[in-house]
Each structure stands twice: as structure tokens, then as C-alpha cells.
Swiss-Prot record:
Lignin degradation and detoxification of lignin-derived products. Multicopper oxidase that catalyzes the oxidation of a variety of substrates, including phenolic and non-phenolic compounds. Has highest activity towards 2,2'-azino-bis(3-ethylbenzothiazoline-6-sulfonic acid) (ABTS), also active towards hydroquinone, phenol, gallic acid, catechol, guaiacol, levodopa, 2,6-dimethoxyphenol (2,6-DMP), tyrosine, ferulic acid and veratryl alcohol. Optimum pH is 6. Retains over 72 percent activity in the pH range 5 to 8. Retains activity above 89% after incubation at pH 6 for 72 hours. Retains activity above 61% after incubation at pH 5-8 for 72 hours. The keyword Secreted applies. Glycans are attached at N11, N128, N164, N207. This is Laccase. GO terms for biological process: lignin catabolic process. PROSITE patterns: MULTICOPPER_OXIDASE1. Cu cation 2 binds at H23, H65. One of its GO terms (molecular function) is copper ion binding.
Length: 237
């Protein structure tokens, strides 16, 4: 696996150096692990670094993020899915592709370098990059579309900086088949408590009436609840 990172950030309200840590890979290469000042130097602005490591025996859901101070909390984070051609659970679902990834993240209106808002909680919970803050009911929400009768493997990824989230989808159970990139015995639940850096795969059967259903990700503190669509997205048949 190779990831070339170029540091071009010139916004001095945030840290301009960076590192990248690929979370969950047992890659065994200190130089590519991305822990700033522990086993690597930060990438200086205007420079680049090639992360190069192997993970031939790992499959599942992973994430990456900055590992320099609080830069992660300002948005430098994302996900990976490594598909297993011999997935033991492949008979349990019909659909698994880039539209079946669900990311949860906390979003702060003040850059971490400028304020101390973290103790108060995030302004917004973002689901696949979209969400509302209190008093802003006009902001768009993520819509995830499904077809009635199909079974979907969703990859749920917590990119949270601080709070954990309780995740659920109105009217639907979830059959968990993977935890932190490890295939597991499937367990049916109606909600998942997911902490920073954790990943789950679950199978959702689209067996309800054609309608819209709330997807909910309630944070452990801060702007909790679902008034005006905060901490929410939409599952649409």
C-alpha cells in the first residue's frame, strides 16, 4: 500500500505541518505509522512523504487521520475499505460498494488551534460529511438511498475526535458482521455505540414500506438529541 501525502496547507489558523496514521492496519513499519515526534517527523508545509507498507492478510473497514496535535479534529480524516474476495459473509448481503459507507464525525466551528470548544462538545455531528448545528435547520442532510427488498452491507466508521455516538436507523435492525476490520459472528441489534476510531459492518435488509427513515447518531455530550434534524441523516426507499 502506498500513500503520497503533500502538505500544502497555508492557513495559519490551523497547523500547517501534518502526519497521516492509517488506523487499524497491522503494518509493522514504524516509519510509515504516522505518529508525529514518536516515530516520524511531521511533513513540513510544501513537502511530501510517501507512506509505504504492506497488509496482505487484512481486509475490512479502516480509517486514516492526522496524528499531529488536534489537526484530526479540524477535518483531516477519512476511511478505507479493503474488500475480501473470500468474504465469509458474502451470502448475507446483495450490495456493498462506495455508497454503503457511513462516516460519523464531530465538527467544530472554531479551529482547534484558536479555541477551547472541545470541552463543550461539537457544534455539529456530520454523517457522510453533512449535518446541522443547533438553530440551523436549513443545512442539507445526507440521503442514503436503498431499494426495497435488497440487503445492504454498510460500513460504519467513527471519525470522531472526542464524543462517542449511539447509531440507529428508525424501523430497521442491523446485523453486525465485522468489528474493527475483523469478521465476526453476526449479531442483530437495534443500535450501535461506536467510539472514536472504531468500525463496524452491518447488514440492513430494506424490508420496510417505501418512505423516508431517520438515521440517528446521538453524541455522548454536546448538542444531543434530534431537534430540527441535528445528529441525523435520511434513509430513503
Amino acid at each position: 500500500f502506498q500513500l503520497n501525502v503533500i502538505a500544502n496547507n497555508n492557513n495559519h489558523t490551523m497547523l500547517t505541518q501534518t502526519t497521516i496514521h492509517c488506523h487499524g492496519f497491522f503494518q509493522g513499519t514504524n516509519s510509515a505509522d504516522g505518529h508525529a515526534f514518536v516515530n516520524c517527523c511531521p511533513i513540513a508545509s510544501g513537502h511530501s512523504f510517501l507512506y509505504d507498507f504492506s497488509h496482505p492478510d487484512q481486509h475490512g473497514t479502516f480509517c486514516y487521520h492526522s496524528h499531529l496535535s488536534t489537526q484530526y479534529c479540524c477535518g483531516l480524516r477519512g476511511h478505507f475499505v479493503v474488500y475480501d474476495p473470500s468474504d465469509p459473509h458474502c451470502g448475507l448481503y446483495d450490495v456493498d460498494h462506495d455508497s454503503t459507507v457511513i462516516t460519523l464525525s464531530d465538527w467544530y466551528h472554531v479551529a482547534a488551534k484558536l479555541g477551547h470548544s472541545f470541552c463543550l462538545g461539537a457544534d455539529s455531528t456530520l454523517i457522510n460529511g453533512s449535518g446541522r448545528s443547533t438553530g440551523d435547520c436549513a443545512a442539507s442532510l445526507t440521503v442514503i438511498s436503498v431499494t426495497q427488498g435488497k440487503r445492504y452491507r454498510f460500513h460504519l466508521v467513527s471519525l470522531s475526535c472526542d464524543p462517542n455516538h449511539t447509531f440507529s436507523i428508525d424501523g430497521h435492525d442491523m446485523s453486525v458482521i465485522e468489528v474493527d476490520s475483523i469478521a465476526s459472528q453476526h449479531v442483530t441489534v437495534d443500535s450501535i455505540q461506536i467510539f472514536a476510531g472504531q468500525r463496524y459492518s452491518f447488514v440492513l435488509t430494506a424490508n420496510q414500506s417505501i418512505n423516508n427513515y431517520w438515521i440517528r447518531a446521538n453524541p455522548s455530550f454536546g448538542n444531543i438529541g434530534f431537534h430540527d434534524g441535528i445528529n441525523s441523516a435520511i434513509l430513503r426507499y
